[in-house]
């Protein structure tokens, strides 16, 4: 009977990064620039890998899919962010908010799986080079890619299913710049004791499994590199891993802080800053990390530039 006294909320209002009109304009210009760089950088990586035969290897196949995921991941958040900055807030139906959450979580989770697949690829290339063509055959590569997307979608649907099972009948203002699960949970008038735990278990499992794969891969890589007699061989092996390690450290460091650390350890504003970093900034940085610190990509870019202007 108590539920009948509540009015069901039809739409949710995303407050955004700030309510200051002047800051909204500044942030809009900054993040529009970041988004354009993200699109140009990741599309360039995908195009370069497609047109450069020397990059037709499993490592760069995974990198092209990482760039594709980064485009969709960033877009799912950036479009809503720009709309709310222009309108000083944004009203979305609950279903639209659930769809945005599903897309963001799906591609964010797929990125975790892709980073783990890339670590395994580096492990095979450095520790078992003679078996590389067998262990990283096209069939294995597409299986790893399929698992990445399916695993990401399953986590996305877990979050979405939990969100759609909640009732919203009180305050409807989300103190965030996109439909993230934790702020939505605070607005619900349902019992969230179990619903609130399920997404944490799902995301936590993905983080633990993928970090385990990455850590074990790099432990074996480090042992193999330290046993190499050639200094040049060590340097070459290290250089193929530094870009990936940088991307892993940035991404996992941020999402672990947000989703694993107790919420009492940081404020809502700090949560927004960290969320901006892993949803908007990191997708922009990944192409720069993999192009500026990768000899093969730089060489392929040089050849492509020569072909264009010759």
From Swiss-Prot:
Parts of the chain on the Cytoplasmic side: 47-54, 121-133, 218-237, 293-310
Key words of the record: Cell membrane, Disulfide bond, G-protein coupled receptor, Glycoprotein, Membrane, Olfaction, Receptor, Sensory transduction, Transducer, Transmembrane, Transmembrane helix
UniProt membrane topology term: Multi-pass membrane protein
InterPro entries: GPCR_Rhodpsn, GPCR_Rhodpsn_7TM, Olfact_rcpt
Protein name: Olfactory receptor 5P53
Protein family (similarity comment): Belongs to the G-protein coupled receptor 1 family.
Extracellular side: 1-25, 76-99, 155-196, 259-271
Stretches that traverse the bilayer: 26-46, 55-75, 100-120, 134-154, 197-217, 238-258, 272-292
GO molecular function: G protein-coupled receptor activity; olfactory receptor activity
Organism: Mus musculus
Entry keyword annotation includes Transmembrane: yes
Tagged with keyword Membrane: yes
Functional summary from the UniProt entry: Potential odorant receptor.
Any one GO BP annotation for this protein: G protein-coupled receptor signaling pathway
Disulfide bridges in this chain: 97-189
Residues carrying a glycan: 5, 265
GO cellular component assignments: membrane; plasma membrane
PROSITE patterns reported for this sequence: G_PROTEIN_RECEP_F1_1, G_PROTEIN_RECEP_F1_2
Localization: Cell membrane
